[in-house]
Amino acid sequence: MPRAQKGLLLVECDPTVKQLILNMDEQSPGIVIEEIDEERLLVNESRLEQVKAELERRLEENTYQVEE
């Protein structure tokens, strides 16, 4: 069980987004401090903006766009 520590955020997300974050952590270690369960992670607060930007990029990349 993790202890309280300054600079950590509890992130709750669906399993798909969680897997994307875990993949980011494999490529750039130090993002995820600990996996809590299927929908929760402890994330390094100083890397949160990087995670948000990368998630947005990856989700946009994988979203179907209708051409008009």
UniProtKB/Swiss-Prot annotation:
Q: What SMART domains would the database entry show? A: Tbf5 (SM01395)
Q: What Pfam families does the annotation carry?
A: Tfb5
A GO cellular component entry from the record: transcription factor TFIIH core complex
Major place of residence: nucleus
Subcellular compartments: Nucleus
Q: Which BP terms from GO are recorded? A: nucleotide-excision repair, preincision complex assembly; transcription by RNA polymerase II; transcription initiation at RNA polymerase II promoter
GO molecular-function terms, A-Z: RNA polymerase II general transcription initiation factor activity
Q: What are the record keywords, sorted?
A: DNA damage, DNA repair, Nucleus, Transcription, Transcription regulation
* Top-level taxonomic group: Eukaryota
Cite the record's note on assembly.
Answer: Component of the 7-subunit TFIIH core complex composed of XPB/ptr8, XPD/rad15, ssl1, tfb1, tfb2, tfb4 and tfb5, which is active in NER. The core complex associates with the 3-subunit CTD-kinase module TFIIK composed of mcs2/cyclin H, mcs6/cdk7 and pmh1/tfb3 to form the 10-subunit holoenzyme (holo-TFIIH) active in transcription.
Q: Which family does it belong to?
A: Belongs to the TFB5 family.
Q: What does this protein do?
A: Component of the general transcription and DNA repair factor IIH (TFIIH) core complex, which is involved in general and transcription-coupled nucleotide excision repair (NER) of damaged DNA and, when complexed to TFIIK, in RNA transcription by RNA polymerase II. In NER, TFIIH acts by opening DNA around the lesion to allow the excision of the damaged oligonucleotide and its replacement by a new DNA fragment. In transcription, TFIIH has an essential role in transcription initiation.
This chain belongs to the protein called General transcription and DNA repair factor IIH subunit tfb5
According to its UniProt entry, this protein's organism is Schizosaccharomyces pombe (strain 972 / ATCC 24843)
